[in-house]
C-alpha cells in the first residue's frame, strides 16, 4: 500500500477518500530509467514500494476504460513543481544557518561547519536547467540595458547641444531684427528653415531607445521574479 509520493517537494500521501491514485515505477528498465530522469532527484534509486501520485501525469496518460484508473504503457510523469522545491530547500538552508549562528559563537570552526551544513542541503537542490538559463538571460538583459543607457546618454547630449544652438540662433536673429539689421519677420522664415536642418533623427532614436529600455527592464524584472 503506497504511503507517499516520491517526487521532490510533493507532500501527497495516500488517502482513500481523495481522488488521487499512486503508481509504481515501471519494471521495464528503459521506462524505469526515463521516469527516474524526469523526477530529477540526485542519486535517486526507486525501490519496490516507490510510487508517484497521479498529479504528476497528464490526463492523456490514464486508461479509464476499467473500474480503476491505470496508466497507459507509454505514460511518463511530466508535471513537477521544481521551482517551489528549490525555494523550500533554500529557506531551510537559511533557517539552519541562522539557528547555528544564534546558538554558537562565531569562529573559523563554526564558519566551516555552517558552510558544510549549507552544502549538504544544497546538494539535494537537484540540478535543473531553468535556473541557469534564467541567470544567463538576466545577465544578457542587464548588458542590453547598459548599452541602451549609453546610447540614450549620447542622444541626450546631442539634444542639449542642438537646443543651445537653437536658442542662440533665435536670440541672435531677434536681436538683429530689433536693431534693424534684419527686416522684421525674418525670424518667421529663417528659423523654421534652420530647424529643418537639425538632426531630428537623433531624437527619434532617443525615443526608441527609451522604449526599448523600458521593455527590457520589465522583461528583466519578470525573469528575476520567476526564480526568487
Curated annotation (Swiss-Prot):
Cross-referenced Gene3D superfamilies: THAP domain (6.20.210.20)
Xref: InterPro entries: THAP2, THAP_Znf, THAP_Znf_sf
Keywords, comma-separated and alphabetical: DNA-binding, Metal-binding, Zinc, Zinc-finger
Zinc finger (THAP-type): 1-80
Single annotated GO MF: zinc ion binding
Keyword Zinc-finger: yes
A cellular-component GO term for this protein: nucleolus
Entry protein name: THAP domain-containing protein 2
Native source species: Homo sapiens
Gene (UniProt): THAP2
Amino acid at each position: 500500500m503506497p504511503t507517499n509520493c516520491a517526487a521532490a517537494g510533493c507532500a501527497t500521501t495516500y488517502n482513500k477518500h481523495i481522488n488521487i491514485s499512486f503508481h509504481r515505477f515501471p519494471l521495464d528498465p528503459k521506462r524505469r530509467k526515463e521516469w527516474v530522469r524526469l523526477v530529477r532527484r540526485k542519486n535517486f534509486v526507486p525501490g519496490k514500494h516507490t510510487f508517484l501520485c497521479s498529479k504528476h501525469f497528464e490526463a492523456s496518460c490514464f486508461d479509464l476504460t476499467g473500474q480503476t484508473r491505470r496508466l497507459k504503457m507509454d505514460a511518463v510523469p511530466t508535471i513537477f513543481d521544481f521551482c517551489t522545491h528549490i525555494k523550500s530547500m533554500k529557506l531551510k538552508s537559511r533557517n539552519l544557518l541562522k539557528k547555528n549562528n544564534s546558538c554558537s559563537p562565531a569562529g573559523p570552526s563554526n564558519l566551516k561547519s555552517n558552510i558544510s551544513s549549507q552544502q549538504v542541503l544544497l546538494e539535494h537542490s537537484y540540478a535543473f536547467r531553468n535556473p541557469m538559463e534564467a541567470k544567463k538571460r538576466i545577465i544578457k538583459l542587464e548588458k542590453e540595458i547598459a548599452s541602451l543607457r549609453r546610447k540614450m546618454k549620447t542622444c541626450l547630449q546631442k539634444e542639449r547641444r542642438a537646443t543651445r544652438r537653437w536658442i542662440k540662433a533665435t536670440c541672435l536673429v531677434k536681436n538683429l531684427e530689433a536693431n534693424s539689421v534684419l527686416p522684421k519677420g525674418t525670424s518667421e522664415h529663417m528659423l523654421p528653415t534652420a530647424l529643418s536642418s537639425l538632426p531630428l533623427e537623433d531624437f527619434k532614436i532617443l525615443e526608441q531607445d527609451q522604449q526599448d529600455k523600458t521593455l527590457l527592464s520589465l522583461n528583466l524584472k519578470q525573469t528575476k521574479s520567476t526564480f526568487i
